[in-house]
């Protein structure tokens, strides 16, 4: 209702003879009859009419009423990606990774500046000297330990000619070999065993077919502890002694100590 009154108040109704018209103060006009422009000789107007006419050049008062604030609009669509930013600072060091697979073997290296592979004098002086060699003077037969009583070499004194046994004093690895000549002629055979602490570690056999003599021989490499005994035992048949010719022999030596 207030808006209607504000709109109607500025309206001025005037009649100038037969060509009456309606005039709205402000910038709006409602024309019902021809409204010629008035010249200098136009009829006089009332004071109120002139005042209203003079005010027609000023803007009318605002008729707008401010309402409440509207709701926020919808979110717009994402804009295009911006240009890349400057590189950031280096990050912290990460944890160690898992262990990788072993790599391939590298190429062979250059030859060293060392001399030849000859054993040094220090090696000779540090390796224990244990070695023996003995021959069989007297003949044996049946089942008994062969007593090689013709001793030629006995470094370390580990071999006993009276018992025919080698007794270890220095633990280590040893090499032993034996050759026993069979005394045949009666069609029998001979067996000779190398024993360690009474257990057979090597055997050899000689057979008498159409000849009187044959050899039984064998070799071993044994690890010995202190106190171990090694000997040759006749296990049937006849062994030829050979006096001082040493047809039957027993020998051994240390390879390296523990």
UniProtKB/Swiss-Prot annotation:
Residues 78-95 have a biased composition (Pro residues). GO terms for cellular component: cerebellar climbing fiber to Purkinje cell synapse; climbing fiber; collagen trimer; cytoplasm; presynapse; synaptic cleft. Its main location: secreted. It holds the Pfam family Collagen. GO terms for molecular function: signaling receptor binding. Residues 125-258 form the C1q domain. One of its GO terms (biological process) is maintenance of synapse structure. Keywords: Collagen, Secreted, Signal. It is found in: Secreted. Expressed in brainstem. It comes from the Eukaryota. Residues 1-16 form the signal peptide. Residues 67-77 have a biased composition (Low complexity). Residues 39-117 are annotated as: Disordered. Gene3D superfamilies: 2.60.120.40. Residues 67-115 form the Collagen-like domain. PROSITE patterns: C1Q. Interacts with ADGRB3. Forms heterooligomers with C1QL4, when proteins are coexpressed; this interaction does not occur after secretion. May regulate the number of excitatory synapses that are formed on hippocampus neurons. Has no effect on inhibitory synapses. This is C1q-related factor. It comes from Homo sapiens.
């Amino acid at each position: 209702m207030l808006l209607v009154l504000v709109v109607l108040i500025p309206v001025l109704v005037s009649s100038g003879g037969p060509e009456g018209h309606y005039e709205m103060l402000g910038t709006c006009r409602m024309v019902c009859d021809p409204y010629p422009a008035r010249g200098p000789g136009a009829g006089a107007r009332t004071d109120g009419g002139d005042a209203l006419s003079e005010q027609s050049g000023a803007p009318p008062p605002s008729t707008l009423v401010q309402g409440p604030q509207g709701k926020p609009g919808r979110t717009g669509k994402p804009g295009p990606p911006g240009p890349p930013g400057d590189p950031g600072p280096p990050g912290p060091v990460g944890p160690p990774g898992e262990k990788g697979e072993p790599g391939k073997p590298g190429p062979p290296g250059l030859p060293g500046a060392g001399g030849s592979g000859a054993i040094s004098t220090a090696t000779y002086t540090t390796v224990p000297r244990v070695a023996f060699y003995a021959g069989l003077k007297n003949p044996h037969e049946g089942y008994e330990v062969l007593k090689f009583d013709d001793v030629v070499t006995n470094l370390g004194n580990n071999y006993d000619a009276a018992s025919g046994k080698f007794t270890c004093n220095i633990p280590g690895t040893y090499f032993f070999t034996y050759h026993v000549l069979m005394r045949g002629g009666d069609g029998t055979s001979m067996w000779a065993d190398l024993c360690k602490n009474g257990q057979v570690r090597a055997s050899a056999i000689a057979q008498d077919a159409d000849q009187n003599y044959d050899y039984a021989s064998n070799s071993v490499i044994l690890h010995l502890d202190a106190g171990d005994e090694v000997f040759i035992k006749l296990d049937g048949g006849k062994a030829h002694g050979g006096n001082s010719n040493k047809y039957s022999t027993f020998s051994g030596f240390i390879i390296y100590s523990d």
